[in-house]
A protein has these predicted regions:
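Transmembrane-helix signature of 12-pass secondary carriers
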Residues: 1-439
C-alpha cells in the first residue's frame, strides 16, 4: 500500500497550531509598528526631539526589516525553521524590553532598528514553516490568513496605547514594553514546535524527518514521494535556473501592492482633508471605517483563493483597485458627497487587502525548500524598501501636486501590477510544494 504524503493529510488541530505560531509573527509585527506611533505622541514630554529624530524613530523599524528579511531568510534555510524561530523571538523580546530603560532618543533609534531586523527575520521563518506543514488544499488560506493578524496586532496596539495614556509622563515606556508580553507567550509556545520535515530532508536528515511525520500524522505518512535528495543553500540560487523570473514577479507585485497600502493607510486623514472634508469627525471617522475594511477584505479572499485560484484573486483586484483610485482622482475635481468617497475607498480597501494575502502565498510556494526562506526574505526586503519610499514621498506629492494627481499616480502603479500579474502570475492552487516549485 502506497504511503500518503503529509501535504495530502486533512486539516487538523496540528495545522492550526502551526498557523498560530506563524500568525503570531504577523501580530507582533503589526503591534510593534502601531505602538511606536502612539508612543511618539507622548515622548516629547521626556525628550526634546527634532523632526529628524522623530522621523528616525518612525522609520527605524522598517529600516531594520530590510536587513532582517534578507539575512534572516538565508539563515532560516541554513539553520532551520525551528531554531531560527526561537532565536529570533528571544532577541526580539530582549530588544523590546530594553526600550523601557532608554535614557535618550538615540538609544531608542538603535533598539527600533534591531527590533526591525528581528521582525524582518520572522517573516520568512513563519511563511516557510506554514507552507511546509500546510495541506495542499488549504495552504493558500492558511498562508493568506497570516496577513490578517498584522491588522489585528496594529489595531490592538492603538487600543492598548489609549488605555495607557492616563499614566501620564513616562507612559510611552509602558506602551513600548507592552509588546514584550505577546513575544514571551509566542516564544514559550514555539519551544515545543517540531522542525520542518521538508527542511530536514534537504539536510539529508531523513530519519528525523520521518520520525516527526509519524509522530504528528501517524504511520503510513511520508514527507514526499519525490523530495528525497539533500541540497545546500546558496543566496544566488533565487536568481538562477528560472527562479530569477519568480523573484522578479514576487518582488514586483508585492512592492506595487504595498506602496499604495502603506502610503494611503498612513495619510488617509490628510487625503480626506484634500477632498474637502476638513471636519475632524469626518476625517477620522472616515479613516477608521476605511482601515476597518482593510481587515474585512482579507476574509473573503481566503475562501476565494482556494476556490478560484491564485491568479484571478491577484489579477482582478489589481485592476479593480486601480479603477477605484483613478475614479477618486476624477471625482476630486468636483464636490462629491462624503459617503460616496468613503464607499470608493472601501472598495479599494477590500480588494487591496484581499490581494495582499498573496504576499504570504506566492513567496513560499514558488521557491523550493532549500531556498524558500531566502526567496521569501529577499522579496520581503524589496517590498519594505518600496513601502518606505512610497510612505516618504506620498505626502510630498500630495502637498505639491494635489490629491487628483496623487490618486492617478497610485492608480498607475496598481495598473502596472495588473499587467505584470496577468502575464507572470502562475496558478499553484492545490499543488504540492514540489509541483508549485517546479512550474
Amino acid at each position: 500500500m502506497k504511503k500518503r504524503e503529509m501535504e495530502d493529510m486533512p486539516l487538523c488541530k496540528f495545522h492550526m497550531k502551526i498557523f498560530a505560531y506563524a500568525s503570531g509573527s504577523s501580530f507582533v509585527d503589526g503591534y510593534s509598528l502601531g505602538i511606536i506611533a502612539i508612543a511618539l505622541s507622548v515622548m516629547q514630554s521626556d525628550f526634546d526631539m527634532s523632526v529628524t529624530m522623530i522621523g528616525l524613530l518612525g522609520m527605524g523599524t522598517l529600516g531594520g526589516m530590510v536587513i532582517g528579511g534578507l539575512v534572516g531568510g538565508y539563515f532560516t534555510d541554513i539553520l532551520g525553521r525551528k531554531k531560527m524561530f526561537i532565536i529570533d523571538m528571544l532577541l526580539l523580546g530582549i530588544f523590546t524590553t530594553l526600550q523601557f530603560f532608554v535614557t535618550d532618543p538615540t538609544q531608542l533609534v538603535v533598539l527600533r532598528f534591531l527590533i526591525g531586523i528581528a521582525l524582518g527575520t520572522d517573516y520568512p521563518i513563519a511563511g516557510s514553516l506554514m507552507s511546509e506543514f500546510a495541506p495542499s488544499k488549504h495552504r493558500g488560506a492558511l498562508l493568506g490568513g497570516i496577513n490578517a493578524f498584522w491588522f489585528i496586532g496594529y489595531a490592538i496596539s492603538y487600543l492598548i496605547g489609549y488605555f495607557l495614556l492616563p499614566l501620564g509622563q513616562g507612559s510611552w515606556r509602558w506602551m513600548l514594553i507592552s509588546g514584550a508580553l505577546p513575544i514571551v507567550l509566542l516564544l514559550l509556545a514555539r519551544l515545543n514546535m517540531p522542525e520542518s520535515p521538508h527542511w530536514l530532508i534537504k539536510q539529508g536528515r531523513h530519519k528525523e524527518a520521518n520520525t516527526i511525520v509519524e509522530k504528528v500524522f501517524g504511520q503510513g505518512v511520508v514527507v514526499s514521494h519525490e523530495e528525497q535528495e539533500a541540497k545546500k543553500t546558496s543566496l544566488v540560487d533565487i536568481f538562477k535556473n528560472g527562479y530569477g523570473k519568480r523573484t522578479f514577479f514576487v518582488s514586483t507585485f508585492w512592492s506595487l501592492q504595498v506602496m499604495t497600502t502603506f502610503a494611503i493607510g498612513t495619510y488617509i486623514p490628510e487625503i480626506l482633508g484634500q477632498f474637502g472634508f476638513q471636519d475632524g469627525s469626518q476625517k477620522y471617522l472616515g479613516s477608521a471605517i476605511i482601515n476597518l475594511f482593510y481587515l474585512i477584505g482579507i476574509f473573503p479572499a481566503l475562501y476565494l483563493v482556494e476556490k478560484y485560484g491564485r491568479r484571478p484573486t491577484l489579477i482582478w483586484p489589481f485592476l479593480i483597485t486601480a479603477i477605484a483610485l483613478f475614479s477618486l482622482g476624477v471625482l476630486s475635481a468636483g464636490s462629491t458627497p462624503f459617503i460616496f468617497i468613503i464607499l470608493i475607498f472601501i472598495i479599494y480597501g477590500i480588494f487591496n487587502t484581499g490581494m495582499g494575502s498573496h504576499q504570504w502565498i506566492y513567496p513560499y510556494e514558488l521557491f523550493p525548500t532549500h531556498v524558500r526562506g531566502t526567496g521569501g526574505g529577499f522579496t520581503t526586503t524589496i517590498s519594505r524598501i518600496a513601502s518606505a519610499i512610497s510612505t516618504f514621498f506620498f505626502p510630498v506629492i500630495l502637498d505639491n501636486f494635489g490629491v487628483s494627481i496623487t490618486m492617478y499616480i497610485a492608480a498607475f502603479l496598481l495598473m502596472i501590477g495588473f499587467v505584470i500579474s496577468a502575464f507572470m502570475a502562475p496558478e499553484t492552487k492545490s499543488m504540492n510544494l514540489k509541483e508549485a516549485g517546479s512550474i
